[in-house]
Design a protein with these regions (language model features):
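Electropositive nucleic-acid engagement tracts
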Residues: 25-33, 40-105, 226, 344, ...
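Short linear Ser/Thr-Pro motifs
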Residues: 49, 121, 273-274
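Short secondary-structure transition/capping motifs
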Residues: 42, 67-71, 123-125, 163-170
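Single, function-defining residue in the core of a domain
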Residues: 1-30, 34-37, 44, 57, ...
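Active-site-proximal, Lys/Arg-enriched surface segment
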Residues: 63, 67-144, 240-243, 247-249
Length: 352
């Protein structure tokens, strides 16, 4: 194919992908001009901000801010559209990330409406930013992942120090969202890291990781061997690599899990599942699926998620939802154009 023909195909794919996104936005009653402006916001030069979009597309800035507040209601429409695309079993991936807000107008204190001064675990200090719960779906039949939600939340430390006036833990938020997803998708398994150990989440078919200091009541190797009930109870870290059936406490109850201990890239992994019938290979494969969400974190930050801050949480939630929809569209576009990354796509768009 000659270069001019390749460019024509690229333009066609670009228009098709973003027309789908614009159509989703318009389901909430937005005009086409506003929907196009929001859909293309992350691809215009400079910061991916609402003000930049209003200037570029000659849209009313105040009206765009109000539109963001209404975008929160678009989430159910977006899930409905995805449920028609994903018809097979899925794995729900739960994680979180820190969204730095370098341009936040809030300095040293939290916003009355949101938490714009949060603890950054990377830099070990409070910084302008937001803790964001992220949730993705992995289509087992097609081997494709979709980011389906990004939700700001407050930490317990912020609540106890009086920095925010509303509080819901990421575990409570994740549990609520999983129930919503089960109504629309065939959820085969849920995967998350060890920080989500809670009776609200560790139920059904879960694959996750245990900390090495977690105590076990009883443990039995699956390849022969007798049940161990060591006085004082063994820690997970005391066990050699292998597969085990183990009993341990979760809240006020005792549960049985399948424990798979691996050495992976010189690191020890203490994987477990509540579905004791899963094979070792299925457990490991499901755990590797969890890393799909880290790619989403990289992509939404490359698209400029951190470029704007808002005093009202509803506007922030709308802004995050916009990035959720855009990143899925961009990923489809990257694949169809045989590009390698969001950064490469952004360079490509300059010439299309």
């Amino acid at each position: 194919m000659n270069p001019e023909k390749e460019l024509d195909v690229a333009r066609s794919e670009f228009i098709k992908s973003f027309n789908y996104l614009v159509g989703t936005l318009r389901m909430n009653g937005l005009s086409r001009k506003v929907a196009v402006g929001l859909a293309l916001m992350t691809l215009i030069g400079g910061r991916a901000s609402i003000r930049n979009a209003s200037i570029t597309f000659k849209l009313n800035y105040a009206n765009l801010l109000k539109t963001l507040e209404n975008l929160e209601n678009t989430w159910s429409d977006y899930l409905e559209a995805l449920s028609k695309v994903i018809i097979g079993p899925v794995v729900v991936i739960i994680d979180d990330t820190f969204d730095h807000k370098l341009y936040s107008r809030v300095e040293g204190i939290a916003s009355k409406y949101g938490n714009y001064f949060a603890w950054c675990s990377t830099h070990k200090r409070f910084e302008p930013g937001i803790q964001v719960l992220t949730i993705a779906l992995y289509d087992l039949a097609m081997g494709k992942s979709y980011l389906i939600g990004a939700f700001p939340y407050s930490t317990r430390k912020m609540w106890e120090s009086g920095m925010v006036s509303e509080f819901k833990t990421k575990i409570e938020m994740a549990a609520e969202i999983i129930e919503v997803l089960k109504e629309r998708f065939h959820v085969a398994r849920v995967v998350f890291d060890s920080w989500y150990w809670s009776e609200k989440l560790v139920k059904g078919s879960v694959v996750s990781e245990l900390k090495s200091n977690r105590r076990l009541i009883r443990v039995r190797p699956l390849e022969g061997g007798k049940t161990l009930g060591v006085e004082g109870h063994p820690h997970v870290g005391d066990l050699p690599p292998g597969s085990y059936l183990a009993e341990l406490t979760l809240g006020d109850q005792v549960i049985t899990i399948k424990l798979l201990i691996l050495v992976y890239k010189d690191n020890r992994l203490n994987l477990y599942t509540t579905d004791v019938n899963l094979s070792d290979e299925e457990i490991e494969a499901t755990w590797k699926i969890r890393w799909e969400i880290e790619k989403f974190h990289k992509d939404i930050k490359a698209l400029g998620m951190q470029d704007s801050s808002f005093l009202k949480r509803k506007r922030l939630q709308g802004y995050l939802l916009l990035f959720v929809m855009v990143v899925n569209t961009v990923r489809d576009l990257i694949s169809s154009l045989n590009l390698k990354s969001v950064e490469e796509l952004l360079r490509f768009v300059e010439y299309v």
